[in-house]
């Protein structure tokens, strides 16, 4: 394996990270720093805040977010599979059908248990 081919990637990462750190540091050093109570107070359209911004969320929002991530990952697997389907042939097709069947069974299980009900 030729590691010299990865040198541009390493250089890109080092230069990008160094530039980011340098710009943030220069901004912190040269930028004005005069905090007072008015600047640090929360601002909501010219009015005092009506309620605390840190309120509790219903756990169902997190459930929906987790389900979205899971099914989003499923679609992330579907695209490269569709592109490479001609090369991988029937074994790849059957493997993806088993994968999709597992997701379908998981979705049916969540639905049956009431995980998608919002009541």
Swiss-Prot record:
<dbReference type="GO" id="GO:0008137">
    <property type="term" value="F:NADH dehydrogenase (ubiquinone) activity"/>
</dbReference>
<keyword id="KW-0812">Transmembrane</keyword>
<dbReference type="InterPro" id="IPR000440">
    <property type="entry name" value="NADH_UbQ/plastoQ_OxRdtase_su3"/>
</dbReference>
<keyword id="KW-1003">Cell membrane</keyword>
<keyword id="KW-0997">Cell inner membrane</keyword>
<keyword id="KW-0520">NAD</keyword>
<keyword id="KW-0830">Ubiquinone</keyword>
<protein>
    <recommendedName>
        <fullName>NADH-quinone oxidoreductase subunit A</fullName>
        <ecNumber>7.1.1.-</ecNumber>
    </recommendedName>
</protein>
<dbReference type="Pfam" id="PF00507">
    <property type="entry name" value="Oxidored_q4"/>
</dbReference>
<dbReference type="GO" id="GO:0030964">
    <property type="term" value="C:NADH dehydrogenase complex"/>
</dbReference>
<keyword id="KW-0472">Membrane</keyword>
<keyword id="KW-1278">Translocase</keyword>
<keyword id="KW-0813">Transport</keyword>
<comment type="similarity">
    <text>Belongs to the complex I subunit 3 family.</text>
</comment>
<keyword id="KW-1133">Transmembrane helix</keyword>
<dbReference type="GO" id="GO:0048038">
    <property type="term" value="F:quinone binding"/>
</dbReference>
<feature type="transmembrane region" description="Helical">
    <location>
        <begin position="7"/>
        <end position="27"/>
    </location>
</feature>
<feature type="transmembrane region" description="Helical">
    <location>
        <begin position="88"/>
        <end position="108"/>
    </location>
</feature>
<dbReference type="InterPro" id="IPR023043">
    <property type="entry name" value="NAD(P)H_OxRDtase_bac/plastid"/>
</dbReference>
<dbReference type="GO" id="GO:0005886">
    <property type="term" value="C:plasma membrane"/>
</dbReference>
<feature type="transmembrane region" description="Helical">
    <location>
        <begin position="63"/>
        <end position="83"/>
    </location>
</feature>
<dbReference type="InterPro" id="IPR038430">
    <property type="entry name" value="NDAH_ubi_oxred_su3_sf"/>
</dbReference>
<comment type="subunit">
    <text>NDH-1 is composed of 14 different subunits. Subunits NuoA, H, J, K, L, M, N constitute the membrane sector of the complex.</text>
</comment>
<comment type="function">
    <text>NDH-1 shuttles electrons from NADH, via FMN and iron-sulfur (Fe-S) centers, to quinones in the respiratory chain. The immediate electron acceptor for the enzyme in this species is believed to be ubiquinone. Couples the redox reaction to proton translocation (for every two electrons transferred, four hydrogen ions are translocated across the cytoplasmic membrane), and thus conserves the redox energy in a proton gradient.</text>
</comment>
<dbReference type="GO" id="GO:0050136">
    <property type="term" value="F:NADH:ubiquinone reductase (non-electrogenic) activity"/>
</dbReference>
<keyword id="KW-0874">Quinone</keyword>
